[in-house]
Amino acid sequence: MSKREKRNKSRGSSGHNRKAGSDFMAKNRLKEGVVEAPSGLQYAVVEEVSGDQPESHHNVIIHQRCQLLNGKVIIDTYRENEPSEVAVDELIEGYREGLLLMRKGSRYKFFIPPELAWGKKGSRSKIPPNAVLIFDVRLIDFW
């Protein structure tokens, strides 16, 4: 496949992803328990506890499952039973915003639109352009 054909194919999937993502987010915001922030981030509380909340300068230990709208799993630390350690300020914008809402021990689902994730470019071969990302996150600890 030539570079031009690849570029045109990518543009097609980008447009398809944008439409599918927009349709998904419009329907998802109507579901019971889903909250939409002014930024466009949508989230649902799966399990809430009364712990402390992290701040943007913290490092966190989290369990996470990230998947695309088509169900393709990008990462699943629950299955691997190996939580991730990350710096909050290094996360994509939508993930960071959602994580700062959480309390230690809680579990949330984030529905992150492309403009709060990797946008038009995507991320390498794992995340296509204009992809909505669905994260299932448990905040284990932070410091």
Residue ranges and their predicted role:
Residues M1-W143:
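Cross-family detector of peptidyl-prolyl cis-trans isomerase
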